[in-house]
Amino acid sequence: MLGALLLSGAVHAAVQPLDSVVAIVDNDVIMKSQMDQRVREVQQTIAKRGSGVPPAEALQPQVLDRLILENLQLQMGERSGIRVSDEELNQAIGTIAQRNNMSVEQFRAALAHDGLSYNDAREQVRREMIISRVRQRRVAERIQVSQQEVKNFLASDMGKAQLSEEFHLANILIATPDSASSDAIQAAAVKAKGIYDQLKKGADFTRLAATSSSSENALEGGDMGWRKAAQLPPPFGDMLSSMPVGDVTPPARTPGGFIILKLLEKRGGQGQAQMRDEVHVRHILIKPSEIRNEEETKRLAQKIYDRIENGEDFAELAKSFSEDPGSALNGGDLNWVDPNSLVPEFRQVMSETPQGVLSKPFQTQYGWHVLEVLGRRSTDATDQAREQQALNVLRNRKYDEELQTWLRQIRDEAYVEIKLPGATQAAQ
């Protein structure tokens, strides 16, 4: 979503003369002006793709559901003390500008030319970063992939397909709740079949995704980006290899519901890297929590940094303070790591820190870190690269499934009252 910020016209400066509440979401509300603005964004995005633009009324239910989920995640972030500093925000804005082949100044000028507010754009990016960190803590961190799963995957036909084709896909999901009755499942199957029949007759996929799909990317036309066959539910791997670009798959049942995929592009697989740069690094991680906010966490990381600079032992302090369960008992030692397997902020600080020098405290989505580089080397890592690639595929697959389950869960557990005229009332 961030990369498309400029192109989608995501932030409007116009002030609505009248406003009203369209949904109560736990301790917050969603205003009609917010919904109307997001509807316009979606319509502009669809129009820029050359698709038929649905009327606002057709998009409102999807948009409102997206806003409700975003609001719930932002409230979670607030309760957990998750913050995005201005420095991090500036870096993210710079990345967005770079993706659009602009400097930050050119990006600001382009926003102004389109009648968009730079400050509003910054706040939207901030919100998306907070949501990303909430998901990291609530979903990604609890996903585990065993070494045996990796070995089994690499030995499987699906694992071997890792090295072959990639597919640029869009999807339409007709969701079924975990406890759905047989009648509800049958109704979803009938709806999915009806959509598939429309697509085979030439209906616009982007428009149907925006108005009918329950997938998180529905308002982006269902665009999933590039995926390996192994990252997809099993029914789709064989279909896509022999399917022409532009075609759609029949609906397939998955744990989350019935999915239809459209093949937008194909490309061949890439060869395995033979050599890999590795860094031997150790770190201390301090995480914010509901009882220790970001500022207090930063101060604690600074105190630990000062103690190491004053001669205290890094490993002993890591054992006492670090909240990385995978390395704390080893004195913070991460051993030899591939920089590309690390989050960008950690990777950047590590690359800029000379060997044997302690970094100043810095922040990532996990919390505040202090690191020390113990060594650098280049090694033949063909087998490790294959294992890491398999690990990433399995983790991404589990993440996609777990995220959808978690989003349904927080929606079901929240108090939500819909006040949009003509919409179904839902209060929990």
From Swiss-Prot:
Per UniProt, residues of the PpiC domain are 164-265, 276-375
Q: Where is this region: Disordered?
A: 211-230
What is the catalytic activity of this protein? Answer: [protein]-peptidylproline (omega=180) = [protein]-peptidylproline (omega=0)
> Does the keyword field hold Repeat?
yes
The EC number(s) attached to this protein equal 5.2.1.8
Could you tell me the superkingdom of the organism this chain comes from? Bacteria
Q: What is the name attached to this protein's record?
A: Chaperone SurA
Q: Which organism is it from?
A: Pseudomonas syringae pv. syringae (strain B728a)
Instruction: Write the gene name.
Output: surA
